[in-house]
Amino acid sequence: MSANDRAIETLRREIAKLQTDGAAIARKDAGIRAKLASAMAAQAKAKTAPALRLKQAEASRLEKELMATSKSQADIATKIAKKQSSLSAKLVVQANEAKKADAKAKKNQERVSKTQEEATRKLEAGYRKLTLENQSLEQRLQRELSAMKPTAGPTTNADLTSAPPHDIFISHAWEDKADFVEALAHTLRAAGAEVWYDDFSLRPGDSLRRSIDKGLGSSRFGIVVLSTHFFKKEWPQKELDGLFQLESSGRSRILPIWHKVSKDEVASFSPTMADKLAFNTSTKSVDEIVADLMAIIRD
């Protein structure tokens, strides 16, 4: 509460008290006037000189009391008028302060609204930029996939149809074989999955590119073991490009496994892969991952 507001409350209390005091004096004044009228009437009826002098003295005393009450009423009226004037001035100040406070609150609200609108515009601009970047990335990926050509002769439809069907193709970097991929491949095969894995599927004299193309084309699912080693290799990335192309045509489905990498690292390599539901070797064992994969394969 401001000093002006406190002064207003004080003035209102003082005015109310003066009005109460004034009402009491007014009642006293009325009583004196009634007694004075009675004393005057008694003078007219007095039959002896002593009785007359007694009533005259009483009337004189009442007239003096009446003058005192009249003066008190006048003083109270003057005080009330002064305090009413002060109260009016304080109320004007209060109204001006309220007006200023409203203007300040409105200005603050406008500033907050402007800040929120600016933040919304920035978010929308960022979203549009991200959308354009994703579109550009997808277009570039399609161009690169279209530009890919076999280095060891074309892979024909006959090659693909003659290849035995596989449940899973494993794309990986060879550095990850020892600590994860080899155990994954053997556990999958032991669980009954048909696995295309280079150690299982390549024979001396086979064309590496043609064999991989056959494996890709004949597999229902493509496991991609994403690791720091994978990100640095050109050949696994070409396999991934081929899997993307097959997935876009509905012929295969990519199943990512994050091996000792974070989501930020995956997103830096491929935003599309970062958005896919993935298995993580940091949170699941080989047996647990294989159990989940077999559930997907058999679904």
Curated annotation (Swiss-Prot):
NAD(+) binds at residues 173-174, 203. The active site is at residue 239. Coiled coil: none annotated. It comes from the Bacteria. The keyword ATP-binding does not apply. The TIR domain mediates NAD(+) hydrolase (NADase) activity. Self-association of TIR domains is required for NADase activity. NAD(+) hydrolase (NADase) that catalyzes cleavage of NAD(+) into ADP-D-ribose (ADPR) and nicotinamide. This is NAD(+) hydrolase PdTIR. It comes from Paracoccus denitrificans (strain Pd 1222). The lineage of its organism: Bacteria, Pseudomonadati, Pseudomonadota, Alphaproteobacteria, Rhodobacterales.
